[in-house]
Amino acid sequence: MAILEIVKEPAEVLRKKAKPVTKINASIRKLLDDMTETMYAAPGVGLAAPQVGVSKRLIVVDPQDGSGQLYQLINPEIVKAEGWVKGTEGCLSIPGMVGDVWRYEKVQVVALDRTGKKVWIDAEGYLARIFQHEIDHLDGILYTDKCTNLRPVSEDGEEEEEAEVAEVMPEPEAEGAGEPSAEGAGQAAAEAGAEEGEQVTTGVSGERRGSAAAKEE
């Protein structure tokens, strides 16, 4: 495995819609492994192929919540979603900044694993947020397109340390404010009333920490 260079905004590849993977071979599996190594080295909890300069629909995710669960997903797609929650996010491709982003609270992701088997992943809280953030990367969308209160990391370095640790950084106790971003808010309003959810928290003690169950076809 190799540690790859993480490309930074305004790299063009970050704004392209990534191409689906049509053949799973040794090079795809190696890329997944290299992305995993790069994610851990960053360190982060998620990474999408465009972030290492490859415009393919691949993501790797490890919420690092003590479960030991690593997701290496090919052509991931969100097929179900419900609820809204606001959290603070950072991005390895946009260092030094954080912002508040409304996301679905629960999602179901369908994808292929590294062997080509179809998997369904039901995720909520932190894990659901990571999946949404990484899948956005595959469509050329950055969290800054959706966020409010975009800001530099704090001078004391606490936010900076967290932002470097996590591709997605939920804020422990954010105050409720505003509404979901215009993108997708209309649909969410019809489905869930677009009400602000309880804030996702970080750390082992977080009540809304992500959880998931995966099933294979």
Swiss-Prot record:
Q: Does the keyword RNA-binding apply?
A: no
Write out the catalysed reaction. N-terminal N-formyl-L-methionyl-[peptide] + H2O = N-terminal L-methionyl-[peptide] + formate
Active-site residues, record numbering mapped to chain = E134
Q: Which cofactor does it need?
A: Fe(2+)
> Can you cite a GO biological process for this protein?
translation
Start-end of Acidic residues biased regions: 155-176
Record-stated family: Belongs to the polypeptide deformylase family.
- What name does this protein carry? Peptide deformylase
Q: What would be the name of the gene that encodes this protein?
A: def
